[in-house]
Amino acid sequence: MAVKKTDRRAAKTQNAIFTALAELMTEKELRHITVQDISDKADIHRVTFYKHFLDIYDVYEQLTKIILCEVGVLLTQHGEKTPATFYYDILNYVSEHTVYFKMIFSPHNTSRLYQNILKLFIGYEGLFLSEQFGPDYPESVLTCVIRYHVNGCFAVIADWVTTGLERPQEYIVKTLSELDKSIYAYLRSQQA
């Protein structure tokens, strides 16, 4: 029983550290953040920080792995859902983890995490569209459309996050879903 309590406390501390790092990365670059900055922001002692992580870069790496893993799980369910349901799930995840996405879209963040999430989306979109349109579909058209589509979706989501989620989630879902219809119509027109 005591082990579960300790694990829960450890998880709470790690989440506080992750959140502190994310908030700080909206203000300054990773290389300018200190353990003391995180400790102050998370309201923990430095010793507590070092019980969980080696250094700032270890925190960033672990947070990156968690985000990529969770986003990857969402993407694997893409083909099973309508575009509206898929976008709703993605935007739910983003709104539940806004602090991390503010970090991801911050000019102070290294572009590595952003690029890795982008690659995940591009890869899954490629698999999804290949299944939809078959292996004989012109790869050059798919590649161009996938990059356009994923980067466009990211731009809309980044704007939504950086403006404090001021537009209703339903509006973003509807907009992205409607744009998808145009993209799919274009892809079908190129099959002939």
Where are the predicted features?
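Append "Primarily bacterial transcriptional regulators
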Residues: 17, 36-41, 49, 94
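Amphipathic alpha-helical linker/stalk segments
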Residues: 23-27, 33, 63-89, 101-102
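Amphipathic alpha-helical segments enriched in hydrophobic/aromatic and basic residues
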Residues: 25, 35, 49, 56-67, ...
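Short hydrophobic/aromatic patch on the recognition helix
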Residues: 43-53, 153
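Amphipathic alpha-helical packing segments from all-alpha helical-bundle domains
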Residues: 110-135, 140-155, 185
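C-terminal peripheral helix-coil segments that are non-catalytic and often amphipathic
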Residues: 155, 159-192
